[in-house]
Amino acid sequence: MVVNPSQLKAFYKEEGYFVIKNYFNDAEIISLRKVVLKFHELWKEDNKKFYQEEAFNSSLITGSQYLPFNDRVKLFNFISSKKIMAVVKFVIATDPAFMNTQLFFNPVNPTQKDFWHRDCQYDHEIEAQKIAIQETQVVHFRVPLFDELGMELVPGTHARWDNEEEFRVRQEEKGRVSSDNLSTGKKIKLAAGDLLVFSADMIHRGLYGLDRLALDILVFDSAGDFVDYVDDDCLPDISMLDKIDNPTLFINTMNLKSQA
């Protein structure tokens, strides 16, 4: 598999995403899947009502609540592995910092539909969202653990505001709902071993179905104002740092938090 950094950088700048097919081998995915499934089963047990009624994702997979020391170290080593960091550097060349992890799965509720959104809409009103997409953005690095229907993205919306159709659907105005199809949407089917990189603030939705279970690693530019969103518990304990081959991604976040 040949990865062309300059092509991927240019594509991301223009479109707001890119996919590298078969980036991880079977052994890497099997090892990651084992740890993540351990977290997922414990999380489901602990959040039964929420899981049954509405959940489609969880977060803080690297936290201390569900995984023991050694499994957390395995996750931190995957997140900061040469393969991941090489791609991180394509989109955040200087001082990338770790924000969090999320796990995306199918909702139990069969009436629940996938929906269009920009991540920034959960923190900002409309005018602030317009500003957010012109500034430094958080980047998702999605690793599907099983073959899945993938994502639907609106290319280029990391750098432009919604058109009329997109806005009405995303905001559920004038009779539209956020699960309606968009004429500008592009479906990206994913398989175990693929890596999807996309801007958190582009218009996107996950596609429910198949055995959907995808680990998202969220990374931000240290120059951005995001450190307040980082939960201390998702970072490695000091005693873990010498067991992580390349802890720079986490140390950058720790340094930012110490200055906050």
Could you describe each region identified by the protein language model?
Residues M85-A97, A132-Q134, P144-G150:
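Secondary-structure boundary elements
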Residues N106-P107, H158-W161, V219-D225:
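Short edge-strand/loop segments of extracellular domains
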